[in-house]
């Protein structure tokens, strides 16, 4: 209360000595009183990927595209301590790094600043998200029949889209081979690239560089029917190749995997491969859905609902026949969704998926239909749960919804038009965690309608 009075007295004093209201509002005195969460809340961080050699004016353009707001007259600052020049790049201004980087920025509207909070090497999750963004912007590769039928009115469709006359099995297979969420940087090629001094930008490659890359790719992607003499070109010619020319040189490219690799190489300047887990998901396998009673551990105890529908993380302890190991592997903390970034911290979309797959939270959030739509039936409660997860007691739905808006320009979550508190997962949940929205909703419903079985499961887990 005293601090509030002091602020009011200071405001009156400055106005009385002739200070303009706008100057007073923009003063340091007024800024220091602003709620820190409003200006620098981690959920307000905008993640941008670009080459560190690009000028900061390029970063401004990318941020403007992400948030849909003009940032004229905004200045660049590094961690609120050093002002940066927009016509220079970060390397010229004492930030070490090379190639593609992840830049975390905050928009400070009062100060009219674009504050660079962090400059990081992209994580696997970040590269995967970037791959999704890049590939999502590409026109889908066309077959000869598609090209002839759509030459008059070309239509951009998702990468996983198939012909209407294709069978249902082929459509499902098309979804399984969708690679955009599971591309990672190939560290082995990167080391060789540094050793052989191959430029990072593919358009700077020589004939020898292209040949070396292609020989690696033939083994990595198991390319068949490829004639090395057809690929005698330099990097500029490689990057300028159309999909029609690509098809002539490589007629067989299941799932457009190698074409996608080439586009990521051209657009992002990194040599990427499909993550091993995604590679396994591309191969035919037994149906994943089993009855609730049939899913059990080595010790005979059924997994709880939440444990059944979450996949083990890569860091999970391998299960063994011992009771101690089995109990440890059943701990819910060992189960997570793919794509955890920011040093293992849970992201908002992961949190929403987590409570959507917990039958205990069906009174605050629920699935709607079978296409990934969900509704916050108690948005304030959901916000409080998110605040508890992030250790932010002041979290409310307004801040939660603002954080959700950063997903709208990607392929993760979107707002359902015309419906209050309704959102939709646009990503391929089947590829991401192994279950689609319909399967998740069914599993949650099973847990809700059979509380005795869920309670018994928990008892078995504790006893074990």
Curated annotation (Swiss-Prot):
MF (Gene Ontology): DNA-binding transcription factor activity, RNA polymerase II-specific; sequence-specific DNA binding
Sequence ranges of Polar residues compositional bias: 291-300
Phosphoserine carried by residues: 153, 167, 171
Phosphothreonine, modified sites: 157
Region (Disordered): 138-173, 281-300
GO biological processes: cell differentiation; cellular response to starvation; positive regulation of oxidative phosphorylation; positive regulation of transcription by RNA polymerase II; regulation of L-glutamine biosynthetic process; regulation of mitochondrion organization; regulation of transcription by RNA polymerase II
Location relative to the cell: Nucleus
InterPro entries reported in the protein's UniProt record: Ets_dom, ETS_fam, GABP_asu_N, Pointed_dom, SAM/pointed_sf, TF_GA-bd_asu, WH-like_DNA-bd_sf, WH_DNA-bd_sf
Biased composition (Low complexity): 138-157
GO CC list: nucleus
Occurrences of domain PNT (ranges): 184-269
UniProt DNA-binding region: 346-426
Primary residence: nucleus
Coiled coil (residue ranges): none
Listed Pfam families: Ets, GABP-alpha, SAM_PNT
Tissue specificity note: Uniform distribution throughout embryonic development, with slightly higher expression in pole cells.
Family: Belongs to the ETS family.
Protein purpose: May have a role in germline development.
Name of the protein this chain belongs to: DNA-binding protein Ets97D
Organism: Drosophila melanogaster (Fruit fly)
Gene: Ets97D
